[in-house]
Swiss-Prot record:
The keyword Phosphoprotein applies. Influenza RNA polymerase is composed of three subunits: PB1, PB2 and PA. Interacts (via C-terminus) with PB1 (via N-terminus). This is Polymerase acidic protein. It is found in: Host cytoplasm; Host nucleus. Binds 2 manganese ions per subunit. Belongs to the influenza viruses PA family. Plays an essential role in viral RNA transcription and replication by forming the heterotrimeric polymerase complex together with PB1 and PB2 subunits. The complex transcribes viral mRNAs by using a unique mechanism called cap-snatching. It consists in the hijacking and cleavage of host capped pre-mRNAs. These short capped RNAs are then used as primers for viral mRNAs. The PB2 subunit is responsible for the binding of the 5' cap of cellular pre-mRNAs which are subsequently cleaved after 10-13 nucleotides by the PA subunit that carries the endonuclease activity.
Amino acid sequence: MEDFVRQCFNPMIVELAEKAMKEYGEDLKIETNKFAAICTHLEVCFMYSDFHFINEQGESIIVEPEDPNALLKHRFEIIEGRDRTMAWTVVNSICNTTGAEKPKFLPDLYDYKENRFIEIGVTRREVHIYYLEKANKIKSEKTHIHIFSFTGEEMATKADYTLDEESRARIKTRLFTIRQEMASRGLWDSFRQSERGEETIEERFEITGTMRRLADQSLPPNFSCIENFRAYVDGFEPNGYIEGKLSQMSKEVNARIEPFLKTTPRPIRLPDGPPCFQRSKFLLMDSLKLSIEDPNHEGEGIPLYDAIKCMRTFFGWKEPSVVKPHGKGINPNYLLSWKQVLEELQDIESEEKIPRTKNMKKTSQLKWALGENMAPEKVDFDDCKDISDLKQYDSDEPELRSFSSWIQNEFNKACELTDSIWIELDEIGEDVAPIEHIASMRRNYFTAEVSHCRATEYIMKGVYINTALLNASCAAMDDFQLIPMISKCRTKEGRRKTNLYGFIVKGRSHLRNDTDVVNFVSMEFSLTDPRLEPHKWEKYCVLEIGDMLIRSAIGQVSRPMFLYVRTNGTSKIKMKWGMEMRRCLLQSLQQIESMIEAESSVKEKDMTKEFFENRSETWPIGESPKGVEEGSIGKVCRTLLAKSVFNSLYASPQLEGFSAESRKLLLIVQALRDNLEPGTFDLGGLYEAIEECLINDPWVLLNASWFNSFLTHALR
């Protein structure tokens, strides 16, 4: 029986059971049936809790998460398996916060949905006999009792079974499997006859903190926590099992598990073709700002007023001309659109009172640039369903594009520091829970590291542009509204600053569905000459619009000022996510917190202060062809933030697919590095799944190139 228990239950449950028996002075070598009973009860308690969460609306939902969702709260608190002191602390805390009556005995779970403690029973006898024993022992109407048997029967207080049928079926199936496994080994009769009453356990070994989170995050789909996965793996006989299962599914399928060795993986194949192009909704490292310090003009804070004030700071305007035409567009129309913006801004300035918003005249150039009347006419399906050759028009396959170094330069630039402060200390927001000293200290340290970062500028720029565009799309659906691209920051000395990057003209925006597209023309200032990397600017028509005096080491030099113009589009759902780009700050802060937690658990004290203030220590940042790149903790913060920001700026189905599929290969490689002797089948299929996501997206191609660097160094 002891061997069976060690095979059948995951090691953590076995260890907890061993501790409990030791505490009660019982020898598991002799009391083997009791050992099995304790393990079974523990596992049922864990399964009862698995996958059940409470969402933000307070509703109970079932999620089988591939990634733990930070916004969801676990429906059940597990009390069973904790050490006695901790278990009573949890019970007292629950009673204090919910007003629940304190139970006389330690219960197994607490249900936050129904606000009640739950006692779980697992019996080899009749469920009603066992239920009565439990009820007599507890003598409390407030504690809910739920009994399961090995025959698939169950009984619960007032026939209220708490969980949905599927969740209960999972528990019953597991109990039935345990019974069958025991029977096949000739252990069941002895186990069935040995029951003397419910066994409970109040000692528990816990993996906590970062290691627990990393363990729970690194599971295959459909496993909610490491215990379930361990239980599955422990009871798993790989030899022939997978092959057998697959052959049941289809005669054509056969899977041989091949060992995964250092020589097995090959680099991911990046596509050939012309270099990839810039596809972000606004310019990043190439943008240029016209700025005013300490703004105090009339109407300060109204975008149009701010924009006109910023435009007045520049005196080098000249007759615009096209220096890099757009390959397919009517370039004179882009030129005329910019001239129209200048003229209409001029008209505003001559008015007595500047209006709060400006709707552009619907000229032929703007109609063309915004795709007015270009959409094919929609016809009701009923009117044309009888047409014999009715078909959806063919769409071309996207052209393959090769990796280009400009996207690495963009990323490097995003990690750099600027000379402005882009977020205030409270930008990340208060914690939902009462904030502890450590959490607020971490937040302040992190904010100090990233407040000057260019990626943070991109966040604030993205939030502003998306908010303004969504507002205009709803408030002025038929108008070609002029929207200045503005950001606010502070100088090192703390002076306020308003920046103008350029303008957007919005097209018609009757957005009924989340994915309905609004077209816009963006016109952005820059000092970057597009002729240096013409492939990057494939989608743009670039004008030369002025000369700017730049202070340099050798005095003032005149540089041509360019305007990058392109037609673009976005949707309600994309703008909604763009408005929430501040989440990137939170995501990268949580990643840094995981690192601090890991360090703290090793040193057995909070290491926040040392982590941020020990400037001599370096940390791994990422892989490059040269090897593992290292840098200061500030550099790590900024790199993680830049990654999160680029995931938002370059969000796409290609990125989703690449992230999900390459993660599988990453886990296999990590298992190899940890000497876990991983085996794989259909590795070629995994490579195919990864490589079909590498089409033309610059950010995905950069991630694939990083992944290849990682493979090279990980398998040395």
